[in-house]
Amino acid sequence: MSIENLLSSVSLDTLLVIGGYVALGGLYLVVMPLLLFFWMNWRWHVMGKIERFSVYGLVFFFFPGMIVFAPFLNLRLSGQGEV
């Protein structure tokens, strides 16, 4: 069974729903966690109390995506420690 036959047998509504789920899943697991990581790296030492509290809430909300990228991103200051 080819992919064209498979896609033609599925209704357009079903394909739209699947596409919506894939888009939301990608937004939740990839796009927002990366944006949040870069935002934290950029603003970490100048954040106010309310901004830091809201960032902690977003980290909690996007935790599944954050844990995927955590081993690859480093938020430490450059120039710290001996090389």
UniProtKB/Swiss-Prot annotation:
Q: Which family does it belong to?
A: Belongs to the complex I NdhL subunit family.
Read off the HAMAP family from this record: NDH1_NDH1L
Q: Which Pfam families match?
A: NdhL
Query: How is this protein positioned relative to the membrane?
Result: Multi-pass membrane protein
Supply the source organism for this entry: Synechococcus sp. (strain CC9311)
Where does it localize?
Answer: Cellular thylakoid membrane
Source organism, top-level taxon: Bacteria
Which chemical reaction does it catalyze? a plastoquinone + NADH + (n+1) H(+)(in) = a plastoquinol + NAD(+) + n H(+)(out); a plastoquinone + NADPH + (n+1) H(+)(in) = a plastoquinol + NADP(+) + n H(+)(out)
Q: How does it assemble?
A: NDH-1 can be composed of about 15 different subunits; different subcomplexes with different compositions have been identified which probably have different functions.
Indicate the segments annotated as coiled coil, or none if absent: none
Could you tell me the EC number(s) of this protein? 7.1.1.-
Q: Which GO terms describe its molecular function?
A: oxidoreductase activity, acting on NAD(P)H, quinone or similar compound as acceptor; quinone binding
> What is known about what this protein does?
NDH-1 shuttles electrons from an unknown electron donor, via FMN and iron-sulfur (Fe-S) centers, to quinones in the respiratory and/or the photosynthetic chain. The immediate electron acceptor for the enzyme in this species is believed to be plastoquinone. Couples the redox reaction to proton translocation, and thus conserves the redox energy in a proton gradient. Cyanobacterial NDH-1 also plays a role in inorganic carbon-concentration.
- Alphabetically ordered keywords of this record: Membrane, NAD, NADP, Plastoquinone, Quinone, Thylakoid, Translocase, Transmembrane, Transmembrane helix, Transport
Transmembrane feature ranges: 18-38, 53-73
Q: What name does this protein carry?
A: NAD(P)H-quinone oxidoreductase subunit L
Give the GO cellular component terms, alphabetically: plasma membrane-derived thylakoid membrane
